[in-house]
Amino acid sequence: MGQQHGARNGLTHRELPRGMGLLLAMALMNVVLYVCLDHLFISPGRATEDPRRCPPGYFRMGRMRNCSRWLSCEELRTEVRQLKLVGEGAVKRVFLSEWNEHKVALSRLTRLEMKEDFLHGLRMLTSLQSQHVVTLAGFCEEDGTILTEYHPLGSLSNLEETLNLSKYRDVNTWQHRLRLAVEYVSIINYLHHSPLGTRVMCDSNDLPKTLSQYLLTSNFSIVANDLDALPLVDHGSRVLVKCGHRELHGDFVAPEQLWPYGEDTPFQDDLMPPYDEKIDIWKIPDVSSFLLGHVEGSDMVRFHLFDIHKACKNQFPAERPTAQNVLDAYQKVFHSLRDTVMSQTKEML
């Protein structure tokens, strides 16, 4: 009897750690799950400056620990090794190149008559360096060259092809896609409140052209890349813009960008009324729809964005929301959906 009583006591002492171990394992599993959910729902919008950002005139990219001064003409000529052509537009050619064991993008002016646009883009790059814009590594006005960080995933127009690859399957979710849409609106908001005043993204007369102005980074963020056409709007001085000198067509561009005098009156650039930054707002729903794609949950996101998108498509520019209004609405939807999913997950545990 004594031996049996002792055995029962011993069994209880041995089972207690097992029970506690099970509880600890469950608690640990919950912690891991919450961490995973927090990682999945990385709060969008990069409102605060990255503490790793360099002071004006300096850059850091890749695994660089310290900031380096923008490369000079001489350094660009002697230290940068051009590898292959990766892109070409009306203003410049872009070459994948190498500098100090870093992959970089070397842009070369292709036609002298486009030098004004080239220099405008360079001024925008130097003045708008931020988390919203591709990192500038150097330039040479004399040679017509600009060196920027290279992003192997390329243009934002490649998003679907990239996310369809098996290695990126885990990020092909409505959560990550909505975060991209928030970042896109963040860039538009930054341009509308930039250090250089209200800037309008004029190279955006159709969806493919608009997407080509942005790069997809390796950590699946968006940065503006092509800044050759960012004219200034100044409402105080009644300065408005016109994107190009040709007649525009289609429903992607804002109504005020269309020729207003009917088909019977031939288009004349000097008769075309100018417009303001609200043309960027009109295009947000179409760009956002592309970014959201057609994955599970994307239609749910579209439903929650319906009201703000309807406001963006107002025929009267003055009645459209500002970029900040749109950004606030996007972030509200993101956080609301995040809280709903996390609440449902907690209830399942």
Swiss-Prot record:
User: What is the topology of this protein in the membrane according to its UniProt annotation?
Assistant: Single-pass type II membrane protein
Q: What class of enzyme is it?
A: transferase
Residue ranges, Cytoplasmic compartment?
1-19
Intervals, Lumenal compartment: 43-349
Question: Which GO cellular component does the record give, naming just one?
Answer: endoplasmic reticulum membrane
- Disulfide feature: none
Q: Name one Pfam family in it.
A: PK_Tyr_Ser-Thr
Sites where a glycan is attached? N66, N164, N219
EC number of the protein: 2.7.1.183
Transmembrane segment boundaries: 20-42
List the subcellular locations.
Answer: Endoplasmic reticulum membrane
Instruction: Give the catalysed reaction(s), semicolon-separated.
Output: 3-O-[beta-D-GalNAc-(1->3)-beta-D-GlcNAc-(1->4)-alpha-D-Man]-L-Thr-[protein] + ATP = 3-O-[beta-D-GalNAc-(1->3)-beta-D-GlcNAc-(1->4)-(O-6-P-alpha-D-Man)]-Thr-[protein] + ADP + H(+)
Every Protein kinase domain range? 80-349
Q: Look up the coiled coil feature and give its residue ranges.
A: none
- InterPro entries the UniProt entry points to: Kinase-like_dom_sf (IPR011009), POMK (IPR039318), Prot_kinase_dom (IPR000719), Ser-Thr/Tyr_kinase_cat_dom (IPR001245)
| Alphabetical GO biological process terms | brain development; carbohydrate phosphorylation; learning or memory; neuromuscular process; protein O-linked glycosylation; sensory perception of pain
User: Which keywords fit this entry according to its UniProt record?
Assistant: ATP-binding, Endoplasmic reticulum, Glycoprotein, Kinase, Membrane, Nucleotide-binding, Signal-anchor, Transferase, Transmembrane, Transmembrane helix
Function according to Swiss-Prot or TrEMBL: Protein O-mannose kinase that specifically mediates phosphorylation at the 6-position of an O-mannose of the trisaccharide (N-acetylgalactosamine (GalNAc)-beta-1,3-N-acetylglucosamine (GlcNAc)-beta-1,4-mannose) to generate phosphorylated O-mannosyl trisaccharide (N-acetylgalactosamine-beta-1,3-N-acetylglucosamine-beta-1,4-(phosphate-6-)mannose). Phosphorylated O-mannosyl trisaccharide is a carbohydrate structure present in alpha-dystroglycan (DAG1), which is required for binding laminin G-like domain-containing extracellular proteins with high affinity.
Family named by the database record: Belongs to the protein kinase superfamily. Ser/Thr protein kinase family. STKL subfamily.
Q: What is this protein called?
A: Protein O-mannose kinase
Organism, per UniProt?
Answer: Rattus norvegicus
